[in-house]
From Swiss-Prot:
Family: Belongs to the UreF family.
Xref: Gene3D superfamilies: Urease accessory protein UreF
Pfam families noted in UniProt: UreF
Function: Required for the maturation and activation of urease via the functional incorporation of the urease nickel metallocenter.
Keywords: Chaperone, Nickel insertion
Quaternary assembly: URED, UREF and UREG may form a complex that acts as a GTP-hydrolysis-dependent molecular chaperone, activating the urease apoprotein.
Protein name per Swiss-Prot or TrEMBL: Urease accessory protein F
Lineage, highest ranks first: Eukaryota, Viridiplantae, Streptophyta, Embryophyta, Tracheophyta
InterPro entries, per database record: UreF, UreF_sf
Molecular function per GO: nickel cation binding
BP GO terms, sorted: protein maturation
Domain of life (superkingdom): Eukaryota
Gene: UREF
Amino acid sequence: MERVMECDYPASKKNKVVHPMDCEMKEEPTNAASMNQHSLWSQWQLLDSILPTGGFAHSYGLEAAMQSRMVNNPEELRSFVVQVLENTGSLLLPFVCCANKSPDAATWVKLDQLLEAMLTNEVSRKASMSQGSALLRVAASVFTEIQSLQDLRQTFLGSKIVSFHHAPIFGLICGLVGFDSETTQRAYMFVTMRDVISAATRLNLIGPLAASVLQHQVAEDAERMVQKWKDRGVEEATQTSPLLDALQGCHAYMFSRLFCT
């Protein structure tokens, strides 16, 4: 007897059965779909913590806050992370947004120069430059199919025109890789949250499991910050946490420290 199987859709009143081959429908992937899938893999890789951009060398002022006795327990740590996210959203998200919407060299240079003038302490300024230059170097080496990344690095490397600040570079690269504007801004907040909480584990404020729990809990606050500060122009960029800015500036004066900033 010939083997038969029922299709997923309801059978007719005559309980008709069909051959399995009749139920199979194959669609050949189009070139557009294939390229879109490849783009998704690139986007995920850009957010992977294994990408050697130097983010884990910076504590966003957390180490200075600990030594100043301003962050001593998980509750104070959560408050600190939220303040970092608020300040990141208000000050840096406009640069990420604008660079993503216009991922070209001319716009990026203007944004980089403006952010250079706006950063008010030397420690955070150097951290931004270090992470930005590392991110561009890695992106140009990894995403070789995007020629403009290599062109940017070769053109401006060693010049004094730009400082390679992290926020504009991040927005630019995300735009070239295929992120939309809102996803790019949310991704930047995620990377910031991830790195601050990672720094907390290495400072023994919390353990790895508690860090994962905290990241899940703070995600709601991070999304609220995204909705509050997204899609703003750089003329609206502002510092919302002057105390955090002062703490970051104190890092260079600590006698012993684990992080660069």
